[in-house]
Amino acid sequence: MLTRLREIVEKVASAPRLNEALNILVTDICLAMDTEVCSVYLADHDRRCYYLMATRGLKKPRGRTVALAFDEGIVGLVGRLAEPINLADAQKHPSFKYIPSVKEERFRAFLGVPIIQRRQLLGVLVVQQRELRQYDESEESFLVTLATQMAAILSQSQVTALFGQYRQTRIRALPAAPGVAIATGWQDATMPLMEQVYEASTLDTSLERERLTGALEEAANEFRRYSKRFAAGAQKETAAIFDLYSHLLSDARLRRELFAEVDKGAVAEWAVKKIIEKFAEQFAALTDNYLKERAGDLRTLGQRLLFHLDDSVQGPNAWPERFILVADELSATTLAELPQDRLAGVVVRDGAANSHAAIMVRALGIPTVMGADIQPSVLHRRTLVVDGYRGELLVDPEPVLIQEYQRLISEEIELSRLAEDDVNLPAQLKSGERVKVMLNAGLSPEHEEKLGSRIDGIGLYRTEIPFMLQSGFPSEEEQVAQYQGMLQMFNDKPVTLRTLDVGADKQLPYMPISEENPCLGWRGIRITLDQPEIFLIQVRAMLRANAATGNLSILLPMVTSIDEVDEARRLIERAGREVEEMIGYAIPKPRIGIMLEVPSMVFMLPHLANRIDFISVGTNDLTQYILAVDRNNTRVASIYDSLHPAMLRALSMIAQEAEKHGLDLRLCGEMAGDPMCVAILIGLGYRHLSMNGRSVARVKYLLRHIDFEDAQTLARRSLEAQMATEVRHQVAAFMERRGMGGLIRGGL
């Protein structure tokens, strides 16, 4: 072994560059020790973390850094103790830290030794193997000797120079909620984690049943409390998330299996981990996106149960005065319990646009980025800038950059104040043209009441949300009451109710739909025409609710063909006759329109003029289908861009055909509330925009500061562009010249 050791040291010492030397080292150690994995972690004392610099056997992701904080994992423990650690099964050690990207879950045996030169820790040298065994004394001695030789070869200056490429200061992510935040990164390390729970048994099953019962009750009370809190604050969609958690927690089968596991002798924590993971894996194996998302909800339940089984609770004074939360994953419950007055922003390593957490941060107005490919522990206690407009994270930026972002935040605050000052004025262009600014709504009228004076009506009422909150289909009477509240609240303004739009990422808990390709499957009008009794009950409820107000428009979702329109109209007319027979007098006729979100209907507009009264362009799905991109898939989400030239040309074609055939034209996707898109939409001919409440003030402010001819010129130039980046540069210049760059620019 001494000969082999000398050969390795000589080869490493003769390598021209340090990174090449490290690759030689890990390869030759694997061969010499006949082990499956060898890795070198070098210590960055400025950042207080280890970087995985070279490995043979683990997966080192291309283009990204794998880092561990000094106090994290068994590698961190080796460094802190400054002595070897030899384990037969590393995954059972309390310090074990699972890093999914390196694929080390197959390996059990672990031997780590520190690399120390003149009392200065340079790094940690690690070998691993699948077999459950401790490395023998000769192997440990070999690795310790090699680490000592490596310390003599390495210098701190060499290591520091190598870190330049790993000290990422600007990290690309996905924008989840707009805005800019500057604060200290903070990871809540006190929260009990599922991966830290190991198998354990007890003889006192009655005590464990009592503990489990208490945790279930506390979690249920917590969900009810959060639901009431957010409902009282007019954040009904956020409240609905906790109603869903309560529904999952009350599942009889889940509770039965939890208690059965305890009765077999498991401690409550192990029962929670085993059963929750079992249920979550069943959901995760499904192809349907919505059902896959329920796997995450179940794990959230598990985390909360572990939290209530644990005595160590994060106190309110433990949080910094102002912080940016950094986390691997984010749950709505975690967000709800954070001190909102201290939370400046959020950075999440994993996450999707349709997750409950993403919905909630947007509702709360917290600047957020998701898919930030860096370990949260590396960001802990470091100065961060979150740019929720561009989807960027800056780590320890230079003071001049911090000053610039602070200026942008001040500008953003001032623009918001100006927008609020004018929000009750009409949405009128500088050149005099009126634009209708409508609201996208989803729950009870109380949620939208306070916006009544700011908007011109309800452009989209998502009727599926009340359906999703119940354990079965709501009755006709329940639906009448729901729709009546909205129609009467805005009795002097138009209200558009969309018929039930479920399927794909929106599922009813009592009507699960599992498909291989749900986005292109059984959803929207396809479901309700296949099951006309659901459609008839809902339309009758709408017509009855409209009998006294006469301000109803009915919107049909996911229409693909003319025959679907004809069949839906036939059923609506039938429902009208049934209602008139029921109440004994004629009722107002609603306006009928389609949600234009399937590309096929773009080419069928000439045939719709004598069948419907209006079209409402759903830009979210239309963009998705035109670009063939699943916007909730983090791997391809960056391709999704509503300002893609193909999408703009489709919108232009729709506007021209609608005007030619006398169809009332509306738009209700995210583009309607995005200041980056509004001027182009106006230039293309759109005069009816429906958006979320948080966007109303800014959009109205923007509209009052642009001229129609200028918007037309911008739209014409955008249609000539070949790439979305060209369009965005044109819009940015347009907005900057008019002093409104702060509406679209959160970063540099």
Curated annotation (Swiss-Prot):
Phosphoenolpyruvate binds at R462, R498, N620, D621, R631. GO terms for biological process: N-acetylglucosamine transport; phosphoenolpyruvate-dependent sugar phosphotransferase system. Its cofactor is Mg(2+). It catalyses: L-histidyl-[protein] + phosphoenolpyruvate = N(pros)-phospho-L-histidyl-[protein] + pyruvate. Residues 171-748 are annotated as: PTS EI. The keyword Protein biosynthesis does not apply. Keywords: Cytoplasm, Kinase, Magnesium, Metal-binding, Phosphotransferase system, Sugar transport, Transferase, Transport. One of its GO terms (cellular component) is cytoplasm. Residues 128-170 are annotated as: Linker. It is found in: Cytoplasm. The active site is at H356, C668. The keyword Hydrolase does not apply. Residues 1-127 form the GAF domain. InterPro entries: GAF, GAF-like_dom_sf, PEP-util_enz_mobile_dom, PEP-utilizing_PTS_enzyme, PEP_util_AS, PEP_util_C, PEP_util_CS, Phosphohistidine_dom_sf. Its EC number is 2.7.3.9. It is an enzyme of class 2 (transferase). The reaction takes place in three steps, mediated by a phosphocarrier histidine residue located on the surface of the central domain. The two first partial reactions are catalyzed at an active site located on the N-terminal domain, and the third partial reaction is catalyzed at an active site located on the C-terminal domain. For catalytic turnover, the central domain swivels from the concave surface of the N-terminal domain to that of the C-terminal domain. The EI N-terminal domain contains the HPr binding site, the central domain the pyrophosphate/phosphate carrier histidine, and the C-terminal domain the pyruvate binding site. The GAF domain is an important site of signal perception in prokaryotes and eukaryotes. Belongs to the PEP-utilizing enzyme family. PANTHER family: PHOSPHOENOLPYRUVATE-DEPENDENT PHOSPHOTRANSFERASE SYSTEM, PHOSPHOENOLPYRUVATE-PROTEIN PHOSPHOTRANSFERASE. Component of the phosphoenolpyruvate-dependent nitrogen-metabolic phosphotransferase system (nitrogen-metabolic PTS), that seems to be involved in regulating nitrogen metabolism. Enzyme I-Ntr transfers the phosphoryl group from phosphoenolpyruvate (PEP) to the phosphoryl carrier protein (NPr). Could function in the transcriptional regulation of sigma-54 dependent operons in conjunction with the NPr (PtsO) and EIIA-Ntr (PtsN) proteins. Enzyme I-Ntr is specific for NPr. This is Phosphoenolpyruvate-dependent phosphotransferase system.
